[in-house]
A protein has these predicted regions:
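Nucleic-acid endonuclease domains
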Residues: 2-117
Length: 117
């Protein structure tokens, strides 16, 4: 059974599990047809204390990434062609290192907690 959490519910679960002090917060859920976590956050996230949550609503887990400001430069990631102020992140859900298939960056280095719900 899948569970679709709202952004507010995910934020609350993060706070309840000690993940706080974020300046930029976003989440995405797995696109099961391609096994990709797909996200298009604003580029400003790169200069903020960024909490990026990957929601596996089938297995009911949240992978919580905390990415410090300026850990990734804008040129390391791909942007959307139609909205160049947005990043185009596609993380392979089958890759234990959470590799972005577009840029090759491994997001797993910023994984600090997995929360079951």
């Amino acid at each position: 059974m899948t569970s679709n959490l709202t952004k507010t519910e995910i934020k609350m679960l993060c706070l309840e599990n000690g993940i706080e002090n974020f300046e930029f917060f976003n989440f995405c859920s797995i696109n099961k047809s391609v096994n990709i976590y797909w996200s298009n956050p604003d580029k400003e996230c790169l200069t903020k204390n960024w909490v990026f949550v990957l929601n596996d609503n089938e297995n009911r887990t949240l992978k919580c990434l905390v990415i410090p400001p300026n850990s990734i430069s804008e040129i390391q990631l791909k942007t959307r062609k139609d909205k160049p102020y947005k990043l185009d992140i596609q993380i392979d859900s089958d890759n234990v290192n959470l590799r972005d298939t577009r840029s090759g960056i491994f997001f797993g280095r910023w994984l600090i907690k997995t929360i079951s719900y």
